[in-house]
């Protein structure tokens, strides 16, 4: 009747049209798609172009830089990610104290994710401790991913009881991120990839 289609695919397609063609809506649409593809749909390859465009157009937007960094790490571009982290460490110095309080745990999460990808699980756990202890952002999706990554790191180090605790902490957040489903899976069967 009103061309309303409540399907997920239809919604993603409509946001994609806005991201590609919107006069002003493209900014918010690309940010939304980046979040969805990184943390809900678990399709980081689909987030790369959106996050890259946001960073190219808004190079000083720290949050957009974090999204791009996440996409780089999760698509395996580790050498570029390491260099990008160095730039981010300089950029964070220019933020207000409140912005630092909010974004520094995100940056530590990204560093932990990179260490995990490099198979440095103990290094990842050290960085994740900072993220979890200092997390103050309203959106808890990154916190959920931090708990998930903490559990996966413990599983890789064969510390199953700590891994389960981390997975329970992730699930307890009860947000709509893909990390919740992964944590439920790894509660039943340890992460071993």
Enumerate the language-model features and the residues they cover.
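Short coil/linker segments at helix-helix boundaries
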Residues: 1-17, 32
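"A position-specific structural signal for the A-helix of alpha-solenoid helical repeats
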Residues: 32, 67, 103-110, 142-149, ...
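Structural motif corresponding to the intra-repeat A-B loop/turn of tetratricopeptide repeats
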Residues: 5, 40-41, 75, 118, ...
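Amphipathic alpha-helical segments of tetratricopeptide repeats
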Residues: 12-20, 52-56, 86-96, 129-136, ...
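Residue signature of alpha-solenoid helical repeat architecture, marking inter-repeat boundaries
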Residues: 24-26, 59, 102, 141, ...
């Amino acid at each position: 009747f009103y061309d309303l289609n409540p399907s997920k695919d239809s919604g993603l397609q409509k946001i994609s049209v806005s991201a590609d063609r919107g006069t002003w809506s493209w900014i918010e649409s690309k940010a939304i798609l980046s979040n969805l593809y990184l943390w809900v749909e678990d399709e980081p390859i689909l987030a790369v172009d959106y996050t890259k465009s946001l960073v190219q157009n808004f190079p000083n937007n720290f949050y957009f830089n974090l999204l791009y960094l996440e996409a780089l790490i999760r698509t395996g571009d580790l050498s570029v990610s390491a260099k990008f982290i160095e730039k981010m460490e300089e950029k964070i110095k220019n933020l207000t104290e409140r912005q630092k309080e909010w974004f520094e745990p995100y940056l530590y999460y990204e560093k932990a994710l990179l260490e995990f990808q490099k198979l440095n699980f103990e290094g990842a756990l050290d960085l994740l401790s900072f993220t979890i202890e200092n997390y103050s952002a309203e959106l808890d999706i990154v916190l959920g991913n931090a708990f998930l990554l903490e559990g996966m790191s413990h599983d890789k180090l064969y510390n199953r009881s700590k891994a389960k605790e981390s997975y329970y902490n992730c699930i307890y957040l009860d947000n709509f991120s893909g990390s919740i489903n992964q944590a439920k899976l790894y509660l039943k069967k340890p992460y071993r990839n």
